[in-house]
Amino acid sequence: MVLRDRFTAAHPVVHPEIPAINGIAYVMFRQAGADGQTRTATVMPPGRLDRSPCGTGSSAHLASLHARGKISVGETITTRSVIGSAFEVTLLGVTEAAGRTAILPRISGRGWRFGETLVESDPSDVFASGYAVTDVWGPDAATLDPDG
């Protein structure tokens, strides 16, 4: 993650239309194979390897290939993860976002669910977003400490 942090510091990344989307989440290492497929290793915080070929990174790879004139609309690339799972990534079209060239990718492949989390809050819960000790004990909570 050190590499990601250093790159982000040197090259700030901000979405052209949604400034809240900023920074770099993952780092993808790529290697072109003799078979034309791209081998990938995507590192996610705090340093885990993604078991999939990473749809976000594969889309970014497709965009970089298009920007360098190495792929045209209608063409497909294959990205393969460290465990061998594959995505077929097709350049469906080219468009514009905030005055910048953007691509329209289609990603096909297979994924497996390995977890699910459900977080709920009751609308009548006055502490639904959490609480601090002073919320429960009041502003004079410190006076309860005989040494305090």
Name each region found by the language model.
Residues 1-148:
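Active-site proximal loop and beta-alpha junction motif in alpha/beta enzyme cores
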